């Protein structure tokens, strides 16, 4: 009798990619985080897409849209929690992936390492936008705190913060 993970067409793809991956025996569990990053990223994209279908940037109805997602949308509460906790899991996997690279000396491959640094900055910028743009006062607080970190840059810091804000201060609870 054949195992279903080896005979079913879709399960066979997952089995060959994650379980029976042809890899050297000296690869430890540290080398799994690249695949986990891909899984977390796909989960973030899919849940974010479905959450964006119910998004409203108006400060008067923002909280109502969150309660609408949690109460009225089928499994909306699950989408919201998967998206929030998936972001944390994504960054945990990302930092462990970087830690593995530091431990095994991958920084000696400068081209590859520099591409990884650029990807890290792109991920952090995307996460910042995802944190700042949605509903609620936390977005205004997050925008103020995170962008004020740039004011620590000598000579251009305060001008840079004013340029990012588009003025003297953040106006509404959402930056749309």
UniProtKB/Swiss-Prot annotation:
Chain ranges passing through the membrane: 33-53, 77-98, 113-133
InterPro entries: Cyt_b/b6_N, Cytb/b6-like_sf, Cytochrome_b_N_euk/bac, Di-haem_cyt_TM
Keyword ATP-binding assigned: no
Cell compartments where the protein resides: Mitochondrion inner membrane
Cofactor note: Binds 2 heme b groups non-covalently.
Pfam families: Cytochrome_B
Residues annotated as binding heme b b562: 83
Molecular functions per Gene Ontology: metal ion binding; ubiquinol-cytochrome-c reductase activity
Keywords: Electron transport, Heme, Iron, Membrane, Metal-binding, Mitochondrion, Mitochondrion inner membrane, Respiratory chain, Transmembrane, Transmembrane helix, Transport, Ubiquinone
Bilayer topology annotation: Multi-pass membrane protein
Secretion signal, residue range per the UniProt entry: none
Cofactor(s) this protein requires: heme b
Annotated binding of heme b b566, by residue: 97
This protein's GO CC annotations: mitochondrial inner membrane
Additional notes on this entry: Heme 1 (or BL or b562) is low-potential and absorbs at about 562 nm, and heme 2 (or BH or b566) is high-potential and absorbs at about 566 nm.
Annotated family: Belongs to the cytochrome b family.
Subunit structure as annotated in this protein's UniProt entry: The cytochrome bc1 complex contains 11 subunits: 3 respiratory subunits (MT-CYB, CYC1 and UQCRFS1), 2 core proteins (UQCRC1 and UQCRC2) and 6 low-molecular weight proteins (UQCRH/QCR6, UQCRB/QCR7, UQCRQ/QCR8, UQCR10/QCR9, UQCR11/QCR10 and a cleavage product of UQCRFS1). This cytochrome bc1 complex then forms a dimer.
Record's function text: Component of the ubiquinol-cytochrome c reductase complex (complex III or cytochrome b-c1 complex) that is part of the mitochondrial respiratory chain. The b-c1 complex mediates electron transfer from ubiquinol to cytochrome c. Contributes to the generation of a proton gradient across the mitochondrial membrane that is then used for ATP synthesis.
Protein name as annotated: Cytochrome b
Organism: Promops centralis
């Amino acid at each position: 009798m054949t195992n279903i993970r080896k005979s079913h067409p879709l399960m066979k793809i997952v089995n060959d990619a994650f379980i029976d991956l042809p890899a050297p025996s000296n690869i430890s569990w540290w080398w799994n985080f690249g695949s986990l990053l891909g899984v977390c990223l796909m989960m973030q994209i899919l849940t974010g897409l479905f959450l964006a279908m119910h998004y409203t940037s108006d400060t008067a109805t923002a909280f109502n849209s969150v309660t609408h997602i949690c109460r009225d949308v089928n499994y909306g509460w699950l989408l919201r929690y998967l998206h929030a906790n998936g972001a944390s899991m994504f960054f945990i996997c990302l930092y462990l992936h970087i830690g593995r690279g530091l431990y095994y000396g991958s920084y000696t491959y400068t081209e590859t390492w520099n591409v990884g640094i650029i990807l890290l900055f792109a991920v952090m910028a995307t996460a910042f936008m995802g944190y700042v743009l949605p509903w609620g006062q936390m977005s205004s607080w997050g925008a103020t705190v995170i962008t004020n970190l740039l004011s620590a840059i000598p000579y251009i810091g305060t001008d840079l913060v004013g340029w990012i804000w588009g003025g003297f201060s953040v106006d509404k609870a959402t930056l749309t």
